[in-house]
Amino acid sequence: GRLQAFLAKMKEIAAQTL
């Protein structure tokens, strides 16, 4: 669902930030 996509996006951004 959208929540999974949202969490995946956050993880992706976090990975790039850290």
From Swiss-Prot:
Tissues where this protein is expressed: Expressed by the venom gland.
Gene Ontology cellular-component annotations: extracellular region
Keywords on record: Amidation, Antibiotic, Antimicrobial, Fungicide, Secreted
Keyword Endoplasmic reticulum in annotation: no
Residues with Leucine amide modification: 18
Localization: Secreted
Keyword Secreted: yes
Disulfide feature: none
An example Gene Ontology biological process: defense response to fungus
Function: Inhibits growth of Gram-positive (S.aureus, B.subtilis) and Gram-negative (E.coli, P.aeruginosa) bacteria and fungi (C.albicans).
Family: Belongs to the cationic peptide 04 (cupiennin) family. 05 subfamily.
Name of this protein: M-lycotoxin-Ls3b
